[in-house]
């Protein structure tokens, strides 16, 4: 389940949303890290209040945070939530990193390889000595009682998927449709993991979901709500690969049975986890959408 309260609500709202996701039987609760509350800090609080569900970030931008700093923070969060943390990280976008933050977005694949080469050992509380082009570290952390945390990467292109397969636990996709997942994402990351002698990676697919009797209205709403993603190059490439004009063309929209069937079909193409991004148009659609997701996940 993909949470929205972290950007639109209070920390109490985030806790309540995660608690409801756990009560509804979902395996994971994913908190985005955009311009609202800090996802990792929020999940440390959630982890003390909500006892069982996996807690993940989707995703924390890498460029503003040194890998050793985020490793220390994540070990602390992992200790707070009893080892249920999965860190989702991503490059963010050139417009954010360069225009908003004034940092270089050059050579993103080199950046993520250096980043993961440092973050991986530290995530297991192991010392790391690494010299790369973007990052160099000689460090050991001492977070007593902190369980290791998982790492997934918002990897979309082939080189990012290869780096992720070799150095992380899986990918978390967005704006990536079922045909692209089946024909490109899943086989690319699985082949790279096999070639590297790594375990089969997680493929976590996040997609918009709405149960409705008015499909056209829901598509129109999705086009507005998710409009920005079509203008960001990494997502635009995935939409183009799918032959989609925008997120509305890959959103899971329809009757309850249709939505359940489309979610279940993702598992058949190699998606290991599904993260629903609900966008109901009214309270009845909200209830029906949640029920369909629960049915598909049961």
Per-range role (PLM):
Residues 1-298:
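Active-site-adjacent structural elements that line small-molecule/cofactor binding pockets in enzymes
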């Amino acid at each position: 389940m993909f949470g929205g309260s972290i950007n639109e609500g209070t920390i109490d709202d985030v806790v309540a949303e995660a608690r409801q996701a756990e009560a509804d039987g979902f395996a994971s609760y994913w908190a985005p890290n955009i311009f609202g509350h800090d996802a990792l800090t929020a999940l440390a609080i959630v982890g003390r209040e909500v006892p069982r569900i996996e807690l993940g970030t989707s995703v924390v931008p890498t460029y503003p945070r040194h890998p050793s700093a985020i490793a220390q923070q994540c070990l602390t969060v992992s200790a707070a939530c009893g080892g249920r943390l999965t860190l989702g990280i991503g490059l963010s976008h050139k417009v954010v990193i360069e225009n908003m933050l004034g940092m270089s977005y050059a050579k993103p694949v080199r950046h993520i390889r250096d980043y993961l080469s440092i973050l991986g050992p530290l995530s297991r509380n192991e010392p790391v000595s690494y010299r790369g082009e973007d990052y160099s570290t000689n460090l050991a952390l001492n977070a007593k009682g902190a369980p290791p945390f998982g790492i997934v990467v918002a990897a979309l292109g082939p080189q990012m998927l290869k780096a992720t397969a070799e150095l992380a636990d899986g990918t978390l996709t967005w704006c990536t449709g079922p045909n692209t997942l089946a024909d490109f994402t899943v086989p690319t990351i699985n082949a790279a993991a096999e070639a590297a002698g790594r375990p089969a990676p997680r493929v976590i697919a996040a997609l918009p979901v709405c149960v409705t009797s008015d499909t056209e209205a829901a598509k129109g709403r999705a086009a507005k709500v998710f409009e920005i993603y079509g203008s960001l190059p990494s997502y635009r490439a995935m939409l183009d690969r799918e032959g989609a004009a925008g997120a509305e063309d890959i959103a899971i929209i329809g009757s309850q049975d249709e939505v359940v069937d489309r979610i279940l079909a993702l598992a058949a193409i190699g998606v290991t986890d599904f993260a629903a991004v609900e966008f109901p148009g009214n309270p009845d659609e909200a209830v029906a959408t949640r029920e369909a997701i629960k049915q598909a996940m049961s």
